Amino acid sequence: MIIEDVHYRVVFDSRGNETVECEVVAGEVVAKAMAPSGASTGSGEAVVVSPYRYEEIEEEVSKAIIGMSVFDQESVDEALRELDGTDNFSRIGGNFAITASLAVAKAAAEILGLPLYAYVGGVFAKELPYPLGNVIGGGRHAEGSTSIQEFLVIPVGAKTFFEAQRANAAVHKQLKKIFKERGIFAAKGDEGAWAAQISDEQAFEILSEAIQRVEDELGVKVRMGIDVAATELWDGERYVYSDRKLTTEEQIAYMAELADRYDLLYIEDPLHEKDFEGFAELTKQVKCMVCGDDIFVTNPEIIKKGIEVGAANTVLIKPNQNGTLSGTAKAVKIAKDNGYSVVVSHRSGETEDETLAHLAVAFNAKLIKTGVVGGERISKLNELIRIEELMDKPRMVMI
């Protein structure tokens, strides 16, 4: 079955910003994919270009991939890279490339009568990731709130994905109650997490109380994690928090202290995106998942560099950072072949596209980071509940 038509349109993301959707036609099948966007971005990720270039880029992409087999994903993705001609999709845009790439994969899966996770992951796609839920937000996602960008929860005691998401939603609801009880005004940030004028220390304390209430109510063990987004704190010499300025050595010590004090399961981007040695040193000191996002940007070659020095032990996977499904799959394979865990992630500017849920299962990710509330987040979480029903003997992944 060949690709017969490619069409782009401008749509809107969860922040009300314009983004791009790609539609691929193959036979009777029409498949669509939309591009998300990030507020906190790594310098090495695929470039996003204006969605309003859609007519020009549609013409180029159409010439490049129409007539190709919808089942030859690697060749389609290579054609997109060759069309662009740069190493970061700075000409046609990672947003245009990833949507075409994913739409082709979705079309192929539909033609075969397979869910996307089974088409991409094959017979080994049998486990569900735990939802990594952002429940208190700050940093670039909620100005005037905490210095740490995200305070996260992981319902490790859940036996099903439905139970896991219910626990995360319960923590989110308890936080609302606690803020109200304490007279603290809290609004929702970009990802639906609560944003309030509180310190990082207060956030840890309030979240600990919310988790305890949920564990008592539901009987499900919940662990805590953080996304520091440290590149946003780094001024070239120090990590600048609202109440302190830390050298690299002090930042590593602070992260290790937080991991121990709050029994953190997960720390994302604890140091700035160029500090491979700092990542490696912290990874040696703590027993939790140390995840690289801005440092790796879903780039296979950069991930290899990190592996060589022992930077982190977990890789955050964002397909739009890479630009193609094949490139994203390569990044996943390199990470897993070297003993690193994988976390599949949304962006702060999201859409209702549910593709990410399928990729998390296909890549056997430990966690899926896609928020807790909000239609653009729930679309992925509800899709995972549907996937759980589709599986013959579904089980949660081992963390």
Curated annotation (Swiss-Prot):
It holds the Pfam family Enolase_C. Pathway: Carbohydrate degradation; glycolysis; pyruvate from D-glyceraldehyde 3-phosphate: step 4/5. Binds a second Mg(2+) ion via substrate during catalysis. It is found in: Cytoplasm; Secreted; Cell surface. GO terms for molecular function: magnesium ion binding; phosphopyruvate hydratase activity. Keywords: Cytoplasm, Glycolysis, Lyase, Magnesium, Metal-binding, Secreted. Gene3D superfamilies: Enolase-like C-terminal domain, Enolase-like, N-terminal domain. One of its GO terms (biological process) is glycolytic process. (2R)-2-phosphoglycerate binds at residues 149, 318, 347-348, 369. The active site is at residues 191, 318. SMART domains: Enolase_C, Enolase_N. Mg(2+) binds at residues 227, 268, 293. It catalyses: (2R)-2-phosphoglycerate = phosphoenolpyruvate + H2O. One of its GO terms (cellular component) is extracellular region. It is an enzyme of class 4 (lyase). It comes from the Archaea. Its cofactor is Mg(2+). InterPro entries: Enolase, Enolase-like_C_sf, Enolase-like_N, Enolase_C, Enolase_CS, Enolase_N. Catalyzes the reversible conversion of 2-phosphoglycerate (2-PG) into phosphoenolpyruvate (PEP). It is essential for the degradation of carbohydrates via glycolysis. Belongs to the enolase family. This is Enolase.
